[in-house]
Amino acid sequence: MGLWRAPHLPLFLLGTFWAALVPLVWLWPGLTCDPVAWHRQELVLGFAGAAMGGYLLSALPHWLKLAGGEGEGISPRGTMALVLAWVIGRLAGGACQPDGVALAGLALYPLGLALSLVLPVVRAKAWGRLPIALAPLLLLLIALRLRLASDSLTAVLGMALLVALVGGRIVPAFLLARTGDRSGRSPMPFGARLANGALALALLLHLLNAAEVWVGGMALAAALGQTLRMKHWALAPALSGHGDLMLLVLAWLWLPLGLALLGLGLTGAVALPLSTLTHALTMGLMGSMVLAVMARAWMARAPGRLVAGRATIAVFAVLQLTTLSRLALSEAGPAVVPAWACAWTLVAQHCARASLRPVPRPVFSARRGG
């Protein structure tokens, strides 16, 4: 059914289009009555939310097969319903809308996505996947805090936690698969659970209105933990010229770096404003990880591996440069918008072309040989 053959096709296309469009509010502030609020809301709930849904729904059949189920994912009609919910959220959740209308619209997509994941996971008794299936509910928490309290720190910590939960499973899994290891997914190491717990505790402390120094201290602990968990990863393939894996690892590094910068800012160890420091976790982590994962859906297939094309690597490099520029120059926000928007426009073109070609199976990894 064209665009509806696989859930990642429409959701990735919408997400990349939104990533290119939303920052333009800094060049044309009249697009909305509150550019700051709309910008931070839509890059998290619109852009990252669509990308998250595209990945999780595409991974769902694999989860169900591992649990002994039939491995059937969401139907085309289900995908259409989620896309409609996403669009309603963008229309109803505008900065100028009343809070009740906005929150009702913004809640539709996270709730629909969570139900689309949780129900089949519960039916298949794939209990190990339940935390990730429930992860979209964090988007609902972010929407509530952004809308009712103008709380951008919850959004930043919430997105970091989502990447730690989801990315912290898929990045080492892709690395291990490239080594030819077929032993299956190993349990998450205790250190990784501890690192995720520290990040979740930082978010909880903030929600409980704890002093910034306590939130910052826990963010620093989480940064250390997210760095140390990499010692269990099979990093050799990423370090030996496998471009697709290198993108994932480089994207991941923004998580401990961003948490460290955030922690230093909250504890007063650095003088940069938080509005600048948080871009390491939004532009850096969120933008890089979304691209590194979604690009796998259109990368060229070689025996046992994916090949990252020059265009994908170039766009990834542009995202790194725009993030570093934003961090180095606090007032450089509007200046980096054209580069960011152009980069995501190119990614949207890749998504559009991919929707016209056969969907590769598996979507995000190479078929194993032999």
Q: Where does each model-flagged region fall?
A:
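Hydrophobic alpha-helical transmembrane segments of multi-pass integral membrane proteins
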Residues: 1-370
